[in-house]
Amino acid sequence: MLSDAPFEVPPYLLEKAKHLPRCPMAIAGADNEVVLASVRQATEAGIITPVLIGDADIIHSLSDVIGLKTDDLEIVDLTGEEAVSGAAVSLAASNSVKGIMKGHVHTDALMRAAVNRDTGLRTGRRISHVFHMTIPGRDKVLLITDGAVNVAPNVDTRMDIIRNAIDVAHALGNPEPKVAVLSGAEVVNPSMPSSVEGAEIIDRARKGEIDGCLIDGPFAFDLAVSPEAAKIKGIDSPVAGQADIVVVPNIEMGNGLFKMMVYFMSGLAAGIVMGAKVPIVLTSRADPPEARFAATIIAAIIAHGDST
């Protein structure tokens, strides 16, 4: 049942990457071979100028092994997750870098540094995670949010989650993404809180709290992505069956959804944290190199857009 098809970096991202200026990017926890291999790929492709943060001796040793030239690269010699994460965030807060890549540090450590009220990267929005999903052989991009950071977001938080995902879609060239707010069904049911909350989100969005998109819901997943399902169920909506962004009610749905696409369909899940002062590349240890590379390109695109 598991797919053995190779993972693919979306061609359109590779094309966009050709025209990008290098993005200065802090690598939080660069003292790891897998991380440095990703850094080498993105550096040689002209996507980033990395600032390597971690144990300098290990960084130099591993760089020699994988063939990463560090002579012209800045290395910040630090150990310990808190110190490494804090240094990456400090570089972003001072505008020394325009993006952060999570390397060999735990997500919690990096996120704690990013949301620190005194020294972090807070903006007026809630920080949230967006998966950029693509399937080999298909052109359609689907953004899934939030499957990694916010566990059980309330309606106000989900409004920011939606705004952050819309920003990603805009940066990638979709000026009016179709946003589907997910639940277990398309009918509002008081015994299904996500449907009630979904209806509230749509009502507030239509009153002007969210713009730059077409938004509808609550929808079950089939209605969000399948034109045939929408037709059979008689749903008349410009979003039904055409969603570019799906907004999940909780982390369990988002995490399960993206992993099913990865393992059953060889979907490439490029993870980005939005809502902070800079985009943060957030991938897991189980992710293929292609996912980290795609996420790095996306972060560079977003960072470039924020600086123009």
Language-model features: locations:
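Anion-binding alpha/beta catalytic cores of soluble intermediary-metabolism enzymes, centered on
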Residues: M1-L52, A56-V239, D244-T308
